[in-house]
């Protein structure tokens, strides 16, 4: 029994050391990187960056797709991926505050303006008293949406709320609108809900059903928005060669042209 235990222990130690060696080698490999992106239009843009990275920098980019805004940072923090490209700074800051992530921005990508869409009305003048307005429920995009609703005159928020107001900060609501908070991926489908008159949707999700801010939005966020998307990695990985190469590939003319094509002119260069 003692012999068997020693044998198993030795084998276990060997397997463990090989696994760790493999992980270390992969992390330090300047020619390979795993990047998290949101499935859909942003994935299409990232695929162009993937091609540029290979052709110009000899970097193999493995894209890992996600369907929501929470998992990409969780996966990055755990080391399952090396970087992600999907979020703006206010969202990243909130995630770091709430979850204690050691994440950092290493480059800017695009501003994807949010806009108000509807299948029930064509202008805000048609919005009836007591109408339901759907907005994203994550803190940063909720705040972003409420600030936009304020800018177009539908509501008024308390002074000094910054970038993260909530529905509780609404002090004036002339049309008695009912703010309905939904998961961001559900917002495009909410347009078919008979109860929802208007939905504020991020370009990433609006594009999945063929909507673009300039063409289909009843109102659109300004292009000088502070919500530029970022390429993010872990603090201990920010100087890695594979990360630097990916940032260079993403911030290329080819990717900019692809983003404008995919989003029908709805992508604003952020670098």
Swiss-Prot record:
<keyword id="KW-0813">Transport</keyword>
<comment type="similarity">
    <text>Belongs to the NlpA lipoprotein family.</text>
</comment>
<keyword id="KW-1003">Cell membrane</keyword>
<keyword id="KW-0564">Palmitate</keyword>
<feature type="lipid moiety-binding region" description="S-diacylglycerol cysteine">
    <location>
        <position position="23"/>
    </location>
</feature>
<keyword id="KW-0449">Lipoprotein</keyword>
<dbReference type="InterPro" id="IPR004872">
    <property type="entry name" value="Lipoprotein_NlpA"/>
</dbReference>
<dbReference type="GO" id="GO:0005886">
    <property type="term" value="C:plasma membrane"/>
</dbReference>
<dbReference type="GO" id="GO:0048473">
    <property type="term" value="P:D-methionine transmembrane transport"/>
</dbReference>
<keyword id="KW-0732">Signal</keyword>
<protein>
    <recommendedName>
        <fullName>D-methionine-binding lipoprotein MetQ</fullName>
    </recommendedName>
</protein>
<keyword id="KW-0472">Membrane</keyword>
<keyword id="KW-0029">Amino-acid transport</keyword>
<dbReference type="Pfam" id="PF03180">
    <property type="entry name" value="Lipoprotein_9"/>
</dbReference>
<comment type="function">
    <text>This protein is a component of a D-methionine permease, a binding protein-dependent, ATP-driven transport system.</text>
</comment>
<feature type="lipid moiety-binding region" description="N-palmitoyl cysteine">
    <location>
        <position position="23"/>
    </location>
</feature>
<feature type="signal peptide">
    <location>
        <begin position="1"/>
        <end position="22"/>
    </location>
</feature>
<dbReference type="GO" id="GO:1903692">
    <property type="term" value="P:methionine import across plasma membrane"/>
</dbReference>
């Amino acid at each position: 029994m003692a012999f068997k235990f020693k044998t198993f222990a030795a084998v276990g130690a060997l397997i463990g050391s090989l696994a760790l060696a493999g992980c270390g080698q992969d992390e330090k490999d300047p020619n390979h990187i795993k990047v998290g992106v949101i499935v859909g239009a942003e994935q299409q843009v990232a695929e162009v960056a993937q091609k540029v990275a290979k052709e110009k920098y000899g970097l193999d980019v493995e894209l890992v797709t996600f369907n929501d805004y929470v998992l990409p940072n969780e996966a990055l923090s755990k080391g399952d991926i090396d970087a992600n490209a999907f979020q703006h700074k206010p969202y990243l800051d909130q995630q770091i505050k709430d979850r204690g992530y050691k994440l950092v921005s290493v480059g800017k990508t695009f501003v994807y303006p949010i806009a108000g869409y509807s299948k029930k009305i064509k202008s805000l003048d048609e919005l009836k008293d007591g109408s339901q307005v759907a907005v994203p429920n994550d803190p940063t995009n909720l705040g972003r949406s409420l600030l936009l609703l304020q800018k177009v005159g539908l509501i008024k928020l308390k002074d000094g709320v910054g970038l993260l107001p909530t529905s509780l900060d609404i002090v004036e609501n002339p049309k008695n609108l009912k703010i309905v908070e939904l998961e961001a991926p559900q917002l495009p489908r909410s347009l078919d809900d008979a109860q929802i008159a208007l939905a504020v949707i991020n370009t990433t999700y609006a594009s999945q059903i063929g909507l673009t801010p300039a063409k289909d939005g009843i109102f659109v966020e300004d292009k000088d928005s502070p919500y530029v998307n970022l390429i993010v990695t872990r603090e201990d990985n920010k100087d890695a060669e594979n990360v630097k190469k990916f940032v260079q590939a993403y911030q290329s003319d080819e990717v900019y042209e692809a983003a404008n094509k995919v989003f029908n002119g709805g992508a604003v260069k952020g670098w």
